[in-house]
Amino acid sequence: MRLFVGLGNPGARYAANRHNIGFMALDAVARRHRAAPWRRKFQGEASEAVIGTERVLLLKPETYMNESGRAVAEAQRFYKIALDDVVVFHDELDLAPAKVRVKKGGGNAGHNGLRSITAQCGNEYWRVRLGIGHPGDKALVHAYVLNDFAKAERPWVDDLCDALADHAALLAAGEDANFQNRIHLALQGRGWDDVKRVGDKQA
């Protein structure tokens, strides 16, 4: 079994925030792969799906971002899931909008959800880094991630979540490089390879 974790904050107030793109991604995967109904478990919402040929537990921690690791650790212990089989979808300030990178281990880049998971579970889990861009000034970061995606951003967010769901079987099978490439090609095909189109002024 693999564990797919989406990071975000619970409740309607945060649902459309940039910080919640991990929840959005996991919801898209659950819909596409006809996952079981969400239920309250492991200090969050949990579901199960067969993605490709793999049985996958889907988890959205409801502990708030800073305590996400408690939910992940509980689910990991219950099912005896190896850390190498844990995949975390999260927002990434250091990537341009609509860019996706997959990596194992590494630093937390100031992300409190990752920091909590690392503290509770260890560092060698997989990250699916979902680019949301940077506001350009460190002082603006808190407000930026806790604000909703702008109306003009929603098309790329929807296309990104669709692409993640379309190719989730590759990720479940451990084909991380192939998964990342397929996402890139899918978004390129929709025109999102031009960062200026999605408002990224850093590139």
From Swiss-Prot:
Site (Discriminates between blocked and unblocked aminoacyl-tRNA): residue numbering on this chain: N9
Compartments, record wording: Cytoplasm
BP term (GO), one: rescue of stalled ribosome
Catalytic activity field: an N-acyl-L-alpha-aminoacyl-tRNA + H2O = an N-acyl-L-amino acid + a tRNA + H(+)
InterPro entries per record: Pept_tRNA_hydro, Pept_tRNA_hydro_CS, Pept_tRNA_hydro_sf
Claim: Signal is one of the keywords in the record: no
Active site: H19 (proton acceptor)
Site, as annotated: Stabilizes the basic form of H active site to accept a proton: D91
MF (Gene Ontology): peptidyl-tRNA hydrolase activity; tRNA binding
Source domain of life: Bacteria
Binding of tRNA, residues: Y14, Y64, N66, N112
EC identifiers of the protein: 3.1.1.29
Entry keyword set: Cytoplasm, Hydrolase, RNA-binding, tRNA-binding
Matches recorded under CDD domains: PTH (cd00462)
Any one GO cellular component localisation term in the record: cytoplasm
EC category: hydrolase
SUPFAM superfamilies for the chain: Peptidyl-tRNA hydrolase-like
Coiled-coil intervals: none
Function: Hydrolyzes ribosome-free peptidyl-tRNAs (with 1 or more amino acids incorporated), which drop off the ribosome during protein synthesis, or as a result of ribosome stalling. Catalyzes the release of premature peptidyl moieties from peptidyl-tRNA molecules trapped in stalled 50S ribosomal subunits, and thus maintains levels of free tRNAs and 50S ribosomes.
Quaternary assembly: Monomer.
Database matches in PANTHER family: PEPTIDYL-TRNA HYDROLASE (PTHR17224:SF1)
Family: Belongs to the PTH family.
Protein name stated in the entry: Peptidyl-tRNA hydrolase
Source organism of this protein record: Methylobacterium sp. (strain 4-46)
